[in-house]
Amino acid sequence: METVYIVGAVRTAIGKYGGSLKTVPAHTLAAEVMKEAVKRAGIQPDIIDEVILGEVRQSTEASNIARSALLEAGFPETIPGFTVNRLCASSMQAVNSGCQEIWLGEADCIVAGGTE
C-alpha cells in the first residue's frame, strides 16, 4: 500500500452567511485556494491526477464544483474533477476518496478539499 502524504492545507478567510463574500461564487473561492495550495506545495498543476471537492449545497452556477474550480484555477482541462455531496462530511469524504485512489495506485497526486 502506498504511503499517502498531505503536503499542505489552505483555507479562505472566515466569512459569515450573507457577509462580504456572499457575491463570490464558491467555485471562485475554491479556485483561489487550490492555486495557493499547489503553489505552497511547490508542484505544477500538470502532475495533478484529479481534483475532488466536497460541498453541502449544490448551486446551479457550478453543478460539478470540482471541475468548475479547477478550470477557473487555470489547471489543465485534462484533469478530471468530481464533487462529493455528503452534507457535513463532504470534505472529509473528498480527502478519503483521494487517499483511496493513491492507495490503490490509481493516482499519484490529488487535490482534495471542501467548500462552504
Residue map of PLM features:
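Active-site nucleophile and cofactor-binding loops and adjacent substrate-binding regions
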Residues: 62, 81-90
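Active-site-proximal alpha-helical scaffold in enzymes
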Residues: 86-116
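Short, conserved beta-strand segments within well-ordered enzyme catalytic domains
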Residues: 50-52, 83, 110
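Conserved "HGTGT" condensation-loop signature of ketosynthase/thiolase-family condensing enzymes
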Residues: 1-79, 115-116
